[in-house]
Design a protein with these regions (language model features):
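Catalytic alpha-helical scaffold of carbohydrate-active enzymes acting on polysaccharides/glycoconjugates
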Residues: 1-159
């Protein structure tokens, strides 16, 4: 026999979620949400928290705002700056993706883009739910079922 659950719709309901753990959550959103005592969820990738891996948005930001195009050419050769460069990176194995992106991080100076493990301490609050968003934010549809499971489980274990 199923138990019935009573739900009240007297107050409007919504869930505030943040994807990927951008650092702006701490600098921009948290003060406002704290002031109004509003709960929220952050979907995190442990590799982003490690500060040694980044995704297409960061790569685009890095290319546009921070580094000399000669650095891109030195690291990746004659790839186009946006989609073509990201497509070049993502067709590689996960390990090679990480190595390529780490090399770019090493030779460039970019602002803090994602939260770090230390930043999570400032989010230690009952209103904040930290949720798994896989370990490395890879395109799951391009992975085998076993690799998908591994990404999900590793993310869960590390968080």
């Amino acid at each position: 026999m199923k138990e019935s659950i009573e739900v009240s719709f007297e107050k409007p309901k919504a869930v505030i979620c943040f994807d990927d753990g951008f650092h702006s959550i701490v600098t921009n959103a948290k003060p406002i949400l704290d002031e109004h005592n509003i709960p929220y969820v952050i979907f995190l990738n442990p590799s982003f928290l490690d500060q040694n891996y980044f995704s297409e948005p960061l790569l685009s930001h890095l290319i546009e705002k921070t580094i000399d195009h000669e650095v891109i050419q030195k690291t990746f050769g004659n790839k186009t700056m946006h989609g073509g460069l990201w497509n070049h990176i993502r067709i590689n194995s996960s390990i090679k993706q990480i190595k390529l992106l780490q090399e770019l991080i090493t030779i460039s100076d970019f602002p803090k883009y994602y939260l770090s493990w230390n930043d999570l301490e400032s989010l230690n609050d009952d209103r904040v739910t930290l949720a798994n968003h896989t370990s490395h934010h890879l395109f799951l549809s391009s992975l085998s079922i076993e690799e998908q499971k591994s990404q999900i489980m590793l993310g869960h274990q590390r968080l």
